[in-house]
Each structure stands twice: as C-alpha cells, then as structure tokens.
Amino acid sequence: MIVTTTNTVEGKEIEAYLGIVAAEVILGANVVRDFLASITDIIGGRSGTYESKLAEGRELAIREMVNKATKLGANAVIGVDLDFETLRDGMMMCIATGTAVKVK
C-alpha cells in the first residue's frame, strides 16, 4: 500500500478514486509519566515520553486508515493529513485522513 501526503503518485496513474478514508485514535497518558515529562520540559529537554506517544498515535491511525482503504479495494492512499488534538484528562487524539485510490 502506497501512503503519501501528495495528491498524486509519481510514475503512477490513478484509475479510480474510491473515497475518503479516516481513522481516529485516542490515547491516554499516565499521571506519573506526565509529571516526569513536565520536569523534562522545565529543564529544557525533549519529552521522549510524549514523542513516543505521538509516534504511537500516528502509526495506529495510519494503520487503521490503510485497513479501511484496503477494504475499499485501494492500493494507495493520497493526500494524507495527520492532526493531533489534546483532550482533557491527559487524553490525546490522532486523526489520519486521506483519499483511497486505485493506481496502475
């Protein structure tokens, strides 16, 4: 499966547009981990804890979006966009959207 942020796939022709595919993933953060991450932020370092949570959310959302595209008969997803939202109580949401297409 080709997954790209561009609206075309170089060297490929789009045969069919199969529709918009989207996936939402909500992840919780641990209170102790939040506290330790805030200490890292205060002393000016990078928060590896949150970076790994963001990466986990991104990968899960893309995987779910690809699964939905596969069910539509797509072999590529173009125009992929990732959005992250912070929800209350330490929750984070990652949304992946794109257009499922068939390329040749």
From Swiss-Prot:
Listed Pfam families: YbjQ_1
Family designation: Belongs to the UPF0145 family.
UniProt name for this protein: UPF0145 protein GTNG_1265
Origin species: Geobacillus thermodenitrificans (strain NG80-2)
